[in-house]
Amino acid sequence: MKKRFVLFVVTSLLIGLASTSFAAPVVDPVKVGLSKDLIYFVFPDRYLNGDTSNDSFPGYNPRDTAFFHGGDLKGLTGTCSDGDNGLARIKKLGFTAVWVTPLVVQQKPTPNGAGYHGYWGVDFLNVDPHLGTKADMVAFAACAKKLNLKLILDIVTNHTGDVISYNDKTAFLSSDLLNAKNPAWLNDLSNYHNVGSMSNCWGDGPCIQTGDFFGLDDIATEKPVVYNGWADVYGQWIKDYGISGFRVDTARHVDDAFFKNWSPQINAAAKSVGIDNFTIFGEVWDVNPINLMNYVRRNKIQTVLDFPFQRTAAEFAAGYSDATVVENLFAYD
């Protein structure tokens, strides 16, 4: 049975990050730098409101779960010495790493909700003002370093927030949104697939990689300007804040060669600031271990979230199956 990289998170059962091995031997085993860490997963907006001055931005409504609730980086950082709050409390609980949802600037709120979760990014070079400032991020990272807590950042490369509109299947930007995104290459429509929703192709089919995920603008991740651009963006986050790992959202929806082109640049950025064994783990929503294996081997994702184990463990814990189901999963894996 292979070694399993297991995440302990506050919002779910155990989730494994696995470099799937199956029949063919792995000649050069992947080193996962977080393999011995206990990881605390947190939405900063839902942790603690440490700075009420940023509650005035549009999209703040703590009475509605679809909007910002006021949690921020100051609230998550805490005093950095009192074990009853913030990062110091997380450290006191026994965790060795903190995984935060995306911190980048989100698209403007709609009547139906706001990007409190971080997955509707438009400005990938700055911190969303609801969560704080770059100075707050520096303080957050410094506190984590002081407490010897590794930082894991949730990132998105497949899409941006929903800015592009369509007129009779022709993509366009309204005049007030021509420069809505940062960096500038994200404002070039030629860097998107512009084919509309992927809602009709959740299984096989080309639009699983080219269609808009829940209406979000799908980026042409096969283009050098895109994968090199993302390497510059996220490499800078590593250099500025000492990030130890990335969880890559919607990893199954990017181009098959994306990780081959992007990951080496990210690892180089990490090594340039003395971070060895930088960990990249992808969110590939699939409960078939063989399918996950293909993303690791074929697409060269370093490792992926182990959703087959999550499902099996949850069903066992809920009493829907007995221990033999868990045993069979390990034997099969």
What are these regions (language model features)?
Residues 31-36, 90-94, 99, 118, ...:
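Extracellular/periplasmic catalytic domains that process cell-envelope and extracellular macromolecules
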Residues 9-18:
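Bacterial N-terminal signal peptides
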Residues 1-9:
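Bacterial N-terminal signal peptides that target proteins for export
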Residues 72-82, 114-147, 181, 187-236, ...:
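Chitinase-like catalytic core of GlcNAc-active glycosidases
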Residues 23-150:
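N-terminal structural segment of carbohydrate-active enzymes
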Residues 31, 56-57, 108-122, 157-204, ...:
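Aromatic- and acidic-residue-enriched segments that line the glycan-binding/catalytic groove
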Residues 141, 149, 159, 232-333:
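Active-site-proximal helices and loops of the catalytic beta/alpha 8
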Residues 46, 96-112, 154-164, 250-255, ...:
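Short, solvent-exposed turn/loop segments enriched in Gly/Ser/Thr/Pro and often Arg
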